[in-house]
């Protein structure tokens, strides 16, 4: 039974197709890449050796069957056959994995360069270019399996009825690529979240040097992942904003660049745009948690270092007081007459004088140390009540604000001597000049 359906049903069909793909299992009779058969990795693609004169790719036909595995094309012949330019080879070069993703819209094809996937989509064929990276080759194997099941899909069961799948061939291939990319991003984010979350939880219990080093290393890889996700999200956003690119991505049925009927493709791209944006927000939130933890750790380390310095200063102050206390008895310990040998109060007076001198020195230094440790937002000097330190912000402000009696005396002086008396003080003239200069700068 074949009939057309609306936008809401298209979304349900897209989710149903994902469920069908997730229920598929590998079968030994399934036709796929021959050199990669294995019990553990049934669809593992092997990396290839790059060649300067050839491009290597796996080809899918319009039915989703693999027609060629690692087929080599001479580069110049490949460019002429499919109407490409030499600069387009940079997008499909298998030697490197580009950080910046791109979709190049051509009249007869779409060049896809997203993370580990380099592909060319036509209206009835898909070319997946081989890679030299072993890790990327494993991910490409999963893409091959998904492409085969997605491109060969014709009908789907909906409420007990067989419904024809009306999505274009190139859009199904594009969706398979985006699904593979989002799956890789999700897997990578879960890895970063588990590792970084474990380190952050350990740092809450104990600050360790090795854990801080591991956190620094993991934060760098997490930042690279966030940058990669942001670039992909921006790419999808640019596609959604450009009607010309959306119209050019219809290869089976050509549409005019000014046409506005791109609802099915817009829904497809918007779905994966939101998913990619979610990974961006989660990764940025995790990066912010790491930065907050680093700041808290730095504050704790600074506080501990200050406590050690303060303890050392206190020990020094007490040592100085003890030294002063032993200095006076040392003088009386010399073999010289000091005229108090026969006094009944000599010993008590020397001991009392030594203790008093030690107490005075210790108390004075401890007060100075206490004033140093009292830091405020307005003032952090060592003597807020001394004339030497009139830079205290609160006292200086109170000094400059005139009281009622100050204003009354100023008015009386103006009436008696004239307004010239207000500017005889050089410090006030300098202050007024500074205010004027600051106002001009503002």
UniProtKB/Swiss-Prot annotation:
Q: Name one GO cellular component term.
A: mitochondrial inner membrane
TM region(s), chain numbering: 308-328, 344-364
A Pfam family for this UniProt protein? MRS2-like
Record carries keyword Repressor: no
Superkingdom of source:
Eukaryota
**Annotated organelle transit peptide span:** 1-15
The UniProt entry lists membrane topology as:
Multi-pass membrane protein
Q: Chloroplast: present as a keyword of the record?
A: no
An example Gene Ontology biological process = mitochondrial magnesium ion transmembrane transport
Q: Where in the cell is it found?
A: Mitochondrion inner membrane
For this UniProt record, give its keywords in alphabetical order, as a comma-separated list. Ion transport, Magnesium, Membrane, Mitochondrion, Mitochondrion inner membrane, Transit peptide, Transmembrane, Transmembrane helix, Transport
Q: Which CDD domains match?
A: Mrs2_Mfm1p-like
Alphabetical list of InterPro entries matching this protein: CorA_TM1_TM2, MRS2-like
Query: What is this protein's function?
Result: High-conductance magnesium-selective channel that mediates the influx of magnesium into the mitochondrial matrix. Essential for the splicing of mRNA group II introns in mitochondria by affecting mitochondrial magnesium concentrations, which are critical for group II intron splicing. It also suppresses a variety of mitochondrial intron mutations and its absence may disturb the assembly of mitochondrial membrane complexes.
Family, according to the entry, reads as follows: Belongs to the CorA metal ion transporter (MIT) (TC 1.A.35) family.
State whether it acts alone or in a complex, and with which partners, per the record.
Answer: Homopentamer. Forms homooligomers. Interacts with MFM1.
Name-wise, this protein is Mitochondrial inner membrane magnesium transporter MRS2
Organism equals Kluyveromyces lactis (strain ATCC 8585 / CBS 2359 / DSM 70799 / NBRC 1267 / NRRL Y-1140 / WM37)
Name of encoding gene: MRS2
């Amino acid at each position: 039974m074949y009939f057309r359906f609306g936008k809401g049903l298209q979304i349900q069909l897209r989710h149903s197709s994902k469920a069908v793909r997730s229920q598929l299992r590998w079968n030994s009779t399934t036709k796929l890449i021959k050199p990669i058969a294995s019990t553990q990795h049934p669809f593992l693609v092997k990396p290839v050796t790059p060649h300067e004169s050839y491009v290597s790719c796996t080809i899918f036909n319009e039915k989703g069957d693999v027609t060629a595995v690692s087929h080599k094309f001479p580069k110049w012949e490949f460019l002429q056959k499919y109407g490409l330019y030499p600069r387009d080879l940079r997008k499909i070069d298998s030697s490197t994995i580009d950080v910046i993703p791109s979709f190049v819209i051509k009249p007869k094809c779409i060049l896809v360069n997203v993370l580990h996937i380099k592909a060319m989509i036509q209206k009835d064929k898909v070319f997946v270019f081989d890679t030299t990276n072993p890790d990327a080759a494993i991910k490409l194997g999963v893409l091959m399996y998904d492409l085969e099941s997605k491109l060969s899909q014709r009908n789907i069961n909906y409420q007990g009825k067989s419904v024809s799948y009306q999505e274009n061939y190139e859009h199904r291939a594009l969706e398979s690529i985006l699904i593979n990319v989002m799956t890789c991003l999700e897997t990578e984010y879960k890895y970063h979240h588990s590792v970084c979350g474990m380190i952050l939880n350990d740092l809450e219990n104990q600050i360790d040097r090795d854990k801080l080093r591991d956190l620094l290393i993991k934060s760098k890889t997490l930042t690279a992942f966030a940058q990669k996700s942001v670039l992909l999200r921006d790419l999808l956003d640019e596609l959604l904003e450009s009607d010309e690119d959306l119209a050019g991505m219809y290869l089976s049925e050509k549409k005019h660049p000014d046409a506005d009927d791109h609802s099915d493709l817009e829904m497809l791209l918007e779905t994966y745009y939101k998913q990619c944006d979610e990974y961006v927000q989660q990764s940025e939130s995790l990066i912010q948690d790491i930065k907050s933890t680093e700041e808290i750790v730095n504050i704790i380390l600074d506080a501990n270092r200050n406590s050690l310095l303060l303890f050392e200063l206190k020990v020094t102050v007490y040592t100085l007081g003890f030294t002063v206390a032993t200095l006076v008895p040392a003088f009386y310990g010399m073999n010289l007459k000091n005229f108090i040998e026969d006094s009944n109060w000599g010993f008590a007076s020397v001991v009392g004088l030594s203790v008093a001198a030690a107490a005075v020195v210790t108390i004075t230094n401890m007060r100075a140390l206490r004033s140093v440790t009292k830091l405020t937002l307005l003032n952090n000097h060592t003597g807020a009540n001394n004339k030497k330190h009139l830079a205290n912000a609160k006292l200086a402000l109170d000094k400059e604000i005139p009281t009622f009696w100050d204003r009354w005396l100023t008015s009386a002086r103006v009436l008696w001597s004239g307004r010239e008396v207000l500017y005889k003080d050089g410090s006030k003239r300098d202050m007024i000049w500074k205010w004027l200069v600051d106002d001009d700068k503002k």
